[in-house]
Amino acid sequence: MKSGSCIALLLLAVLLLTACSAVPKTKDYSVLDPQLDLETIYIVPFDATLVPPDFGDPIFDQFVDILNARRQQTKVGRFVILKEDLKEVEPAWLIKQIYISGDIWGYIETSGCCSTDMKVKSRLYLYEPGKNSPIFEAFIPVEHYFDHDRSDIATERMRLGKKLAQDLAEAVIKKLTP
């Protein structure tokens, strides 16, 4: 009977630990209109609140590079970065475009004597022309752990950023792939 109790306790612990880890979530609010001209999708620079600039800026650049490298999968002609922040873009022009906006936040490094745990969260939104609400939303949390004797924080921060950029791009590509 003790082994059955131990197994049940172990399964409960695994379930609790699994429930605590953040997982990507996507919400489809609408289907992308198949009649839309997908020649250009604009990307508004992400708001990176409480994220080191040397971490947030490269993620955005890598995200756009991945999208453009894989755009043939999506039937999109090109992904173009808007040079202004969202609040500086003319609303009358923006409402007529297909565009992506997003945020990166919650960057945390927890270091001990021998290891570091890193976490960051991001969310992106896809908008259709004429709509004030997104047709698609993706929440992408990324966690990473490493031992100090195997790597350093700068290298692993870059690895975490690349993973986030890849996950963000994958969510968009999946939504836009016919």
Please report, for each region that a protein language model flagged, where it lies by residue.
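Extracytoplasmic/periplasmic, Sec-exported soluble proteins
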Residues: 51-59, 112, 116-118, 152-164
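Short beta-strand->alpha-helix linker/helix-N-cap micro-motif
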Residues: 68-93
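Bacterial N-terminal signal peptides that target proteins for export
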Residues: 1-9
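Bacterial N-terminal signal peptides
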Residues: 8-18
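Surface-exposed short loop/turn segments
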Residues: 84-135, 144-151, 155
